[in-house]
Design a protein with these regions (language model features):
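Terminal targeting signals and extreme-terminal segments of soluble enzymes
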Residues: 1-166
Length: 166
């Protein structure tokens, strides 16, 4: 790991600082016999986008620990451009929740349709490959504060489902 001071590593960051949109054109190898893109392809794109966002925020490697609330709203068709938009919604001590929104764009018309939404949770790893603290979020807007509060509620729900307390 490069030499970055602990103060710099743990300095608060805004959700916008790590937000990302990834795109990928859907080819025949991504689809099933009906011409719909396999759900696993969409999940992989979401995980890649979310992992990059979490690592950007933590300035550390981050690994997936939970895939939460994946919604398949509409099929993604072969030949569409998939856009995966992600941003951090909540952070804990070493955990980072990323909110993901997937759209499919028809290249000839420019029409975009939301196809998926999901929350993925990552844990930042230190040099010893163990969970390590992450920077807090700078919550500058009412929207940031709302997302954080909703993320905190999802975190508590995940802990309750696992039989643990916050």
């Amino acid at each position: 790991m490069s030499q970055i001071s602990a103060e710099t590593l743990l300095a608060p960051r805004s959700p916008d600082a790590s937000a990302l949109t990834m795109t990928m054109f859907m080819q025949p190898e991504h689809s099933n016999s009906l011409g719909n893109v396999h759900g696993g392809v969409i999940l992989k794109l979401c995980d890649e986008c979310g992992g990059i966002i979490a690592s950007r925020h933590a300035r550390r490697p981050a690994v997936t620990v939970t895939v939460d609330r994946v919604n398949f709203l509409k099929p993604v068709l072969l030949g569409r451009l998939v856009l995966v938009h992600g941003r951090i919604s909540w952070v804990g001590r070493s955990s980072i929740e990323v909110e993901l929104r997937v759209e499919a764009e028809h290249l000839l018309t420019g029409e975009r349709t939301q196809t998926n939404s999901a929350y993925f949770v990552y844990v930042a790893l230190g040099d010893d490959r163990r969970p390590t603290p992450v920077p807090p979020l700078l919550l500058a807007t009412d929207e940031d504060r709302r997302r954080f509060a909703e993320g905190e509620a999802r975190h508590r729900q995940r802990l309750a489902e696992a039989g643990r307390s916050a």
